[in-house]
Amino acid sequence: MLAWLRHRIRSYNTSTYSSILPSASFGKVYKIGTKLNFTLLALCLLLACSVFFNYFYLADNNGLDIDTKGEEEENVFKDRKMVIFPNNFEITDKNLLEYYLKTLEEPLHPQDTIYRNRFIYKVPDVSYTSQTINLFSGLSQNSQSSKCEDLSSSYSFDVSGPQNKNCDLYKVLGKFLNDDSEYFQEISPLFPKLKEMLVKKEIEKHWFQLIGSSVWLEQYGVHLMTSRIFYSSTGDKVKPVVSLTYVQVFDHEWREIENVELIVPDGEGKYKPMTYPTFLPMSVYHNEKQQQGRFYGVEDPRITLVRNKLGYDEPIIVYNSHHRKITDAKSDNDGESNIHFKAYRSIFMAWLWQNQKGKNNVEEIETGKMKNRVYVKSKELIKPNNKREDKEKNWAPFINYQQRLQQGFDSHVYFMYQFQDLKILKCSLLDEEDCVWEYQFNDKNGAGRLRGGTELVNINQLLTTFDHPEIKRVKDLMPQNREIWIGVARAALEKCGCGDKMYRPNIVILIKDGDDQYRLSHVSPFVGLGIPILPWWPDKGLCDGKNLIIPNGISSWHLNKDEDNSVQDYLTLSISRADSTVDLLHIKGLLKSILFDDPNSKLLELNDYGFNNKNIECAVKSSDAFCKKYGSEYKLNNNKEEDKANGNGKGSSS
């Protein structure tokens, strides 16, 4: 409009100047000037109407922020949308807009951005400090009778400081309230005072965010992160009423994209938009009339990628959730039934880009509204012979890369069900069958003190992602048919010398030789990674309550070249501190130290030493010593601070 108006004014100016000549009469000039004035007046009125329409009507109908302070035009459209097509999308760039508007029938504002991904993974530009860990090996001959120090080897790598990614809960929950989605209407009776808490600025007293876990979506050039946002009516972090699953998208430099659509496959040969950030409509059981000890919703979601039968990677989450099952139903003579339920906390798996109608997988008695609502597709994971335990938690997922190569896709996801007396489950991604035992060291049951944290990354797959002479050497040395996985578990210690509980990360390495011979080859004791600790209660000490660092997920792991042309690896680990943060740590050189720089790496040796729990016992024993030392040093330093404060208060020093 402005361009057209400028063009018309220029044309009028040109004709006017050419007409106003010394020989022209005054009347002729007057007529031209009058005509110009009326035309300009009409054009100005038209422009004013256009501006008024765009400024008020579009703002009101598209949820845009009205700029009442005269800021620049782009601030008026600060909520513009970004639409990202995968880099392998079959339609040319020039036809993306038409596909979005006509095929997907989605609206676009002129300020929105639409493009095919061109971004690749970026090595984190952060500062590092050196760290050293010990790994206890289970691959040594006579390891069961060996001393722990004889099984230990040291490895060095670099770690960044934690980068916090907690969201603005006022903003996020305010939008959830204002959007008033079907899912919000269903779940909000569990937190009826949300609006009041927003108005009174009391969100931080009752709402918490933790368990951030993410994956790098290579085809989209973004990080997809899930986290747990939970509500506690009492404000006690160990007594949540309900946990919600929040999903965000970050670009390749870890900056959040606040209004983004990913054009993802729908599983039926077509595509659909997925909008982020958002709360996922999860199919969970809940009852606002019974809240005591129930802990409704999705707890501890961990995200990972699987390759489906259509050949693309899609995100799934593994989580635990409270639900109930009918145990008995009896009818009396009047036709009325008495139904008895049993409550469980079970492990579920959900496909973030797939849907289901209704939620009879968690609620066997559905209401009419529930039957027609759309939820994220989910599946309960049940042990063999339909054996459902009262409580299941902390399964550590991993993928069988050899199976993927043979089939072209992932038909199963595997879980380290138990670290001590190793047990591994194999659960189908394709049907509703129960899980089966992939491996059991013995028939002993019990979680033990070493428990699941992150997923385990398949190192064989990682080694295929980068071409380098050192990588070729390692692949040539690796025993045939050996698979290696590395993950981060956590040892759970109670009253070990600092607070009620202490959790820290423990690095673990799992290997498989042949079809089903698994061994937990290496386990580390507690690793602090130089992470600053947060108190459980803001106004208390570090050894009051719980002292926690929980590993949640391996966000990405990439290989590259270092400055000296040697191979280098970059791992991003997500953690939570004090059950109230979403943090990222960048780790450089962990795989390099364990696999490439160790000339005596037993991971590259073929041996048939039997499995035992000795390395786990050593790791837990060393972790316990870490806790006692940490508690003693904290108390000593705390006493010194108190003495110093008291001495200063008396005007003397001690």
From Swiss-Prot:
Keywords: Cell wall biogenesis/degradation, Glycosyltransferase, Membrane, Signal-anchor, Transferase, Transmembrane, Transmembrane helix. Residues 59-654 are extracellular. Its EC number is 2.4.1.-. Disruption phenotype: Impairs the elongation of beta-mannose chains on the acid-labile fraction of cell wall phosphopeptidomannan. It is a single-pass type II membrane protein. It is found in: Membrane. One of its GO terms (biological process) is cell wall organization. The chain crosses the membrane at residues 38-58. Induction: Regulated on yeast-hypha and white-opaque switches, and repressed in biofilm. It holds the Pfam family BMT. GO terms for molecular function: mannosyltransferase activity. Residues 1-37 are cytoplasmic. It comes from the Eukaryota. Beta-mannosyltransferase involved in cell wall biosynthesis. Required for the addition of beta-mannose to the acid-labile fraction of cell wall phosphopeptidomannan. Belongs to the BMT family. This is Beta-mannosyltransferase 2. It comes from Candida albicans (strain SC5314 / ATCC MYA-2876) (Yeast).
